[in-house]
Amino acid sequence: MIKAYLRTVNRMAAFEKFIAGRLYASGDRTKGGTRPAVIIAMTGVAMGLAVMILTLAITRGFRHQVSEKVTGFSQDIRVINYDVSMGEEELPVSCMQWMLDSLNASGNITHTQRFAAKAGLLRTDSTFQGFLLKGVGQEFDFSFMESCLLEGTVPECTDTVASGRILISKKMADILEVSVGDRVDACFMQEHIRARKFEVSGIYQTNFSEYDRLYAITDIYTLQKLNGWEPYQVTGVEVRAANNDEDPLYDAYLAARNVFNAAADQFGERYLIQTTQQLNAGLFAWLDVLNVNVGMILLLMMGIAGFTIISGLLIIIFERTSTIGILKAMGASDSSIRKTFLILASRIVLRGMLLGNVIGVALCLIQQKFRLVPLDPENYYLDSVPCELQLWWLVLLNIVTFVLSVLMLVGPSSAISRVKPSKSIRFE
């Protein structure tokens, strides 16, 4: 009896798929071309999905590139003297080699680098510009700065000898009217004005106005001598978190806190440990607002796609009233006919999704390759619209779109139950 029931179910499923296939094949084209209902439904799904792909790709690309620039310049965590945050300038912290070794051995940290900083003036014979000179050691990761280089090279920085070279931004170079190889004077205000001459080794541009108008980079040895510090005294330490679990930044923060708390007991200094998000709270709050906007756009596009596919299904049902009547007269149940039209609509949705994927992914790849849509870096930190495609969210978006589209069709398909065979066949 169970086998007989299963055979019946299989036959009904085969019947529904067969009828849906016939309707799809015969209803897809008429003498005048493709049916408007099918075109409307497919276009709505395609355009909705394409816009959703573009929205996610642009937003994720924007967040990723902006975050990379922030962390590329100052890493994930910064450790400085606590009193600096209270308004006391140029107070060093002690950074012994064992502290760096302990951080690097924690497993939650992949890189550490010391830095020293001092505010001053860069000047030429005709003009001057305020700046913050950042001194770095031989362990400094220049990969981000090298990716932002417009010309020249990064200076060779050590903690044992002055390089006499400086890396400045394009904004500074334009103001000072200097280029690679030119010499500039740097003046620093202390009890007496102290000056240093530097050769411009390279010019960078991050498109972050906060960085480009302020920071120049040289060796840490020069800064330690200017400040009168010992070799183990620095402005702070920058730490890069290991991306090895769900919350790598928090684990790296805890590791840094443990090391520097122990150092505070030994040296009597107070250390302030801050993450990139804390240092750039306004920027990351703005990025979070973008996520809210993305959610609203996705809901809107899903609603538009759902509206068009529902409209298309209802039009197809009304056009196929006589077919529904004939199927009912032959003994087909309302649920069976509803499944038939849902299968038909699902095929239309899949066809529209295929077209939407092609359009959305193609536009993203074109923008990645040719950067056709520019941005004002003064306002958006980037010079072109970023697009970041990842397979996992692309697959997830397609699955959610298909499931929600089919679920939205269940209600409108109930119109089939109102079709009376006698009236619909006579009407035809």
Region locations from a protein language model:
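Short cytosolic juxtamembrane segments of multi-pass membrane proteins
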Residues: 414-428
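Hydrophobic, regular-secondary-structure patches
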Residues: 50-132, 157-160
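Mechanotransmission and gating elements of multispan inner-membrane complexes involved in transport
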Residues: 189-294
